[in-house]
A protein has these predicted regions:
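Conserved dinucleotide-binding and phosphotransfer motif residues
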Residues: 9, 83, 115
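Phosphate/diphosphate ligand-binding glycine-rich loop within oxidoreductases
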Residues: 1-43, 147
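Conserved S-adenosyl-L-methionine
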Residues: 82-86, 171
Length: 173
């Protein structure tokens, strides 16, 4: 947003403190559960008359990596408390008080990607974040890992994501 032009035209620009955080956070958790437990796959099979006992995997005591520990990322940390996740976070701004209270460990993005069972992205789309989840980064993830992006789609290189799924470099997204 061109703030100078907006100011000259008398247009007020503001950033709201309230976000749709509860809806986004619940969606993030639901997507984690859906992929890990293969809920959609099983539902589709049953509708097609196929009965496969696919248990999927539990989320309990996995490592959750959160890219972007702002309002939504912090809300996710609070929501998943009962899963006993080990929580890693990558963010340019560290809230040490929150991290200590909620047992969040800040780390660099490469450490987060290589150690996390689930990676959940909560970033604004900027010139710096556009395409940040490229082939190199996606291929650092564990083959059984899950990628959740409830931010903007352009943060992930879609061709690279497709390749990582097709080549089974990650479990699901």
């Amino acid at each position: 947003i061109d703030l100078e032009t907006a100011k000259k035209l008398g247009i007020t620009i503001s950033k709201t403190k309230t976000t749709p955080a509860p809806a986004v956070v619940e969606l993030s958790l639901n997507l984690m559960l859906d992929i890990a437990r293969k809920i959609t796959n099983q539902n589709n099979d049953v509708k097609n008359g196929v009965w496969n006992k696919q248990m999927g995997s539990l989320l309990q005591e996995k490592t959750l990596g959160i890219i972007g520990l702002g309002t939504i990322g912090k809300s996710l940390v609070k929501l998943v408390k009962g899963f006993n996740f080990r929580i890693l976070a990558f963010d340019l701004f560290h809230d040490e008080k929150f991290a200590k209270e909620h047992k969040v460990n800040y780390c660099d993005i490469d450490t987060l990607l290589t150690q996390s069972d689930i990676v959940s992205i909560h970033l604004n789309l900027t010139a710096e974040t556009k395409g940040m989840m490229n082939k190199e980064r996606l291929y650092k993830m564990k083959p059984e890992s899950i990628l959740i992006n409830t931010s903007r789609g352009e943060i992930i290189d879609e061709k690279a994501l497709y390749g990582s799924l097709k080549e089974k470099k990650i479990l699901g997204a």
